[in-house]
Design a protein with these regions (language model features):
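Conserved hydrophobic/aromatic packing and binding residues within compact polymer-binding modules
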Residues: 17, 31-32, 42-45, 72
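Recognition helix of helix-turn-helix/homeodomain-like DNA-binding domains
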Residues: 36-51
Length: 85
């Protein structure tokens, strides 16, 4: 059961990264460059296929997406609340 929870969170993190990236009209390559991570790795994280360390997530969220953990994890995706538009 715990394995499925881990899979679920990887997918949710990837979906949120993609959501923020597309909202900001950025490509995976642009985010990867700003975050100093490999574009292929970035693609795998975004698609829920790879785990990213906290350090790497920090680089992607803060540097690559110019966001922060509070905003990143406050999305409806993680807490079931709807975002106001």
């Amino acid at each position: 059961m715990r394995y499925y929870c881990l899979m679920d969170i990887k997918v949710k993190i990837g979906l949120r990264i993609k959501e923020l990236r597309t909202d900001k009209n950025l490509t995976q390559e642009e985010v990867a460059w700003k975050a100093d991570v490999d574009r292929t790795f970035m693609n795998h994280v975004e698609n829920g296929k790879r785990n990213a360390s906290v350090d790497t997530l920090t680089k992607i969220i803060c540097n690559g997406l110019d966001s922060n953990f509070k905003d990143f994890f406050s999305a409806e995706l993680f807490n079931g609340k709807r975002r106001s538009k």
